[in-house]
């Protein structure tokens, strides 16, 4: 596969099942690139929310939590990762949406 896109998907997966999704996408499909977006929970204060952004979200990550997850995935499955924000950036809470671009590292 050339690429996989998980746009606003991972937060809908029950945490105990997240490892299966990770393995299916990064381990078995193993595309050259994977694009992942997910809400930034820190930004929820701008929406005056208590809790998750939507009722069907199983979790929402802070920027640090998302970064830790992306780095775990990159090390485990051999991908480089770049992190970005999508939407208006607030200096204290970051952007509303987090964006990771994974690219498969090629062995020399």
Q: Which residues fall in each region the model found?
A:
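S-adenosyl-L-methionine-dependent methyltransferase catalytic module, highlighting the catalytic core
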Residues: 1-6, 13-108
């Amino acid at each position: 596969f050339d690429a996989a896109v998980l746009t606003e998907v991972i937060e809908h997966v029950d945490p105990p099942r997240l490892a299966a999704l990770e393995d299916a996408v990064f381990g078995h499909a193993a595309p050259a690139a994977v694009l992942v977006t997910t809400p930034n929970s820190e930004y929820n204060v701008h929406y005056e929310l208590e809790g998750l952004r939507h009722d069907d979200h199983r979790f929402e990550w802070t920027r640090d939590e998302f970064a830790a997850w992306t780095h775990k995935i990159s090390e485990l499955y051999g991908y480089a990762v770049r992190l970005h924000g999508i939407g208006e950036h607030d200096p204290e809470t970051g952007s509303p949406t987090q964006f990771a671009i994974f690219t498969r590292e090629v062995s020399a």
